[in-house]
């Protein structure tokens, strides 16, 4: 992926995350639940003082430091490995985008706005940035696993 496309994609993904959070705050009261796709997905405005899926509540400085380290390392890795395959680039793009999206909330609000509730499973309420992080990490693990299978 070319550097310009990567940066543009990063900006668009972070903007989508921030716009989704802005929309939730302006249309749904704190704690209110609104069906989005009945029986599948509801929207619920929550203020999360923890990490992804509400773990480690009230540890903001810990998350700021970890986020800066992870994003910094991902950018360093991209810069020093210019010939990564598209899947690793996509994984790192999602990880960086998700990290930045939640980092903006932590710095601006001292909490992260969560809103997506899966009605069909007992699971934590999460946000778009959490989704980026989850998919990015899963994709990166698959890439690394495949490399190991092929002896790279």
From Swiss-Prot:
Any one GO molecular function term: aspartic-type endopeptidase activity
EC number in record: 3.4.23.36
Pathway: Protein modification; lipoprotein biosynthesis (signal peptide cleavage)
Pfam families on file: Peptidase_A8
Residue ranges crossing the lipid bilayer per the database entry: 5-25, 61-81, 84-104, 125-145
Keywords, in A-Z order: Aspartyl protease, Cell membrane, Hydrolase, Membrane, Protease, Transmembrane, Transmembrane helix
Predominant subcellular localization, coarse grouping: membrane
A GO-annotated cellular component: plasma membrane
Entry keyword Hydrolase: yes
Catalytic site positions: 114, 130
Reactions listed under catalytic activity: Release of signal peptides from bacterial membrane prolipoproteins. Hydrolyzes -Xaa-Yaa-Zaa-|-(S,diacylglyceryl)Cys-, in which Xaa is hydrophobic (preferably Leu), and Yaa (Ala or Ser) and Zaa (Gly or Ala) have small, neutral side chains
Membrane topology according to the record: Multi-pass membrane protein
Keyword Iron-sulfur: no
Compartments, as annotated in UniProt: Cell membrane
GO biological process: proteolysis
Family, per entry: Belongs to the peptidase A8 family.
Biological function: This protein specifically catalyzes the removal of signal peptides from prolipoproteins.
Protein name in UniProt: Lipoprotein signal peptidase
Highest classification ranks of the organism: Bacteria, Bacillati, Bacillota, Bacilli, Lactobacillales
Gene name per UniProt: lspA
């Amino acid at each position: 992926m070319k550097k310009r496309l990567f940066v543009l994609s990063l900006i668009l993904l972070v903007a989508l995350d921030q716009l989704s959070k802005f929309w939730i705050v302006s249309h749904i009261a704190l704690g209110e639940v609104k069906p989005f796709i009945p029986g599948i997905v509801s929207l619920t405005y929550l203020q999360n003082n923890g990490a992804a899926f509400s773990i480690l509540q009230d540890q903001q400085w810990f998350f700021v430091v970890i986020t800066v380290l992870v994003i910094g390392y991902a950018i360093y890795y991209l810069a020093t490995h210019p010939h990564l395959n598209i899947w690793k680039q996509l994984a790192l793009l999602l990880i960086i985008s998700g990290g930045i999206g939640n980092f903006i909330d932590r710095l601006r609000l001292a909490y992260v706005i969560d809103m997506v509730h899966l009605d069909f499973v007992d699971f934590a309420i999460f946000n778009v940035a959490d989704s980026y992080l989850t998919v990015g990490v899963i994709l990166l693990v698959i890439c690394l696993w495949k490399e190991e299978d092929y002896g790279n």
